[in-house]
């Protein structure tokens, strides 16, 4: 009898406590259950060349979005040289992050990616239709859908030391590939300073060599994705140019540089010029302003055979949502909302991240004309037409799975290395390179 009354009293007290607590919300009684019910969003992102940008992305963009959307957002920063391997590991396991952000078009993973057309549609209402660079970098020609979402790119201008080039009568720097070769040859003879173009199997080496081939009309694949390389004289001509440039003005280090090697060489004044995203110059401005004042920018070198001024993007920032993502809806919304921070992203990247959607940074040209860190302030105005001279990886076609495998496997740097080391002639290197390209194309067809 006593036990029964005691039991009823305890139960009654518990109900009173529970009812009273309910006025303060459901998290009061069950904190573990509340935390478990919170949505999560997992992001893997390539490591930006300027670490402060990633700090802002993690501590401001991701954190604020998570707070506003009741979502726990985690961001893992992945070194550029490890991005492809990490992505393959996740794709194979069908497990990992919700969003994977690449510094290039992730066409190789289109089968594991959702269709991103909806994300582009979400952005279109505020910032306009998808831009050409984004379209050609993320469209799958077979499925007619987008395998990723592109929001910014990094142009690849020429960086050169004005005082060095003034020594050979070119204070404004070389304007085409033949003045780069001639001036570079004289500079090495006179000052012992070599050309600083990257030829190694790195991101910058790939971009540099793919750009030279494209500028010489030595296209790897045609607009339909068929192998075109070595089917005309352009390929051998381009390779012979690279060979002459290396022999007359280069150095053995160009073939062995690790990621960022060309930047380190420039900052040490060991080279006279290099092609790179402006992270090179921004790094110089931060570490040694006097050194940075001697570095000038130039639009890409003028190509041959009416190719004009052109250079492939050093980075095409592409975000991919996996089919196995646990929070696809949140991932789509995050990417659509990310565009709203493009203006601040441009500032946090010190101008490295050029907007694919012009409306997001409408005063871009004014910013380039008067940069607060540049000496002189108008130094960056050379980039005002960057969107016009920056085609997509894969041009004249799209960034196809085959092209991106050719790119990411460093087929071109390896082909060039065999020639520069004397293992193959330019003709044999072109032929063997074309055969490797054909094997990759056949694999994807």
What are these language model-derived features?
Residues 183-186, 225-256, 300:
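Glycine-centered hinge/linker elements that transmit conformational signals in sensory
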Residues 143-151, 156, 180-228, 234, ...:
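Extracytoplasmic/periplasmic solute-binding protein
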Residues 102-156, 296-298, 375, 379:
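Hinge/lid segment of periplasmic solute-binding proteins
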Residues 63-131, 163-175, 265, 269-273, ...:
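Extracytoplasmic "Venus flytrap"/periplasmic binding protein-like
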Residues 119-132, 199, 218-239, 286-289, ...:
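Short, solvent-exposed loop/beta-turn-alpha elements that line the ligand-binding surface or hinge
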Residues 114, 166, 372-375, 385-445:
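Conserved C-terminal helix/tail region of periplasmic/extracytoplasmic solute-binding proteins
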Residues 1-10:
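N-terminal secretory signal peptides
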Residues 279-290, 304-410:
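C-terminal lobe and pocket-closing loops
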